[in-house]
Amino acid sequence: MTSNRGQGGIQQLLAAEQEAQHIVAAARNAKMARLKQAKEEAEREIAEYRAQVEREFQRKLAESVGDSGANVKRLEQETEVKIHHLKAGAEKIQYDVVQMFLKHVTTVKN
């Protein structure tokens, strides 16, 4: 009978060990599932953030390109005005400059 009791005790221990292994395996699987879910959630958040940043970048890029076109037009207008002022100023003093050159070229000095 004692050997029966010993066999029963061993069987109980083996059964308890198997149950413990099942519990550990289930816990490990649950942990892996949680990690996988957390990874997928993090990847989804990263993708959403990346898309948001890309949209913001494209919006700012479009704004700056629009501003660039306006700046080009403004600079062209300012340049035309400055060229006109320079030409007008040159026309005003053109006669005097030509006369001064003629005077210096035709005057003989000893």
UniProtKB/Swiss-Prot annotation:
Which branch of life, at top level? Answer: Eukaryota
InterPro entries, per the entry: V-ATPase_G (IPR005124)
Listed transmembrane segments: none
Q: Which GO terms describe its molecular function?
A: ATP hydrolysis activity; proton-transporting ATPase activity, rotational mechanism
- Which keywords appear in this protein's UniProt record, sorted alphabetically? Hydrogen ion transport, Ion transport, Transport
Cellular component (GO) terms are:
vacuolar proton-transporting V-type ATPase, V1 domain
A Pfam family hit: V-ATPase_G
**NCBIfam families, from UniProt?**
V_ATP_synt_G (TIGR01147)
The record's family statement is: Belongs to the V-ATPase G subunit family.
How is the subunit organization of this protein annotated in UniProt?
V-ATPase is a heteromultimeric enzyme composed of a peripheral catalytic V1 complex (components A to H) attached to an integral membrane V0 proton pore complex (components: a, c, c', c'' and d).
What's this protein's function?
A: Catalytic subunit of the peripheral V1 complex of vacuolar ATPase (V-ATPase). V-ATPase is responsible for acidifying a variety of intracellular compartments in eukaryotic cells.
Q: What's the protein here called? A: V-type proton ATPase subunit G
* Gene name in the database record: VATG
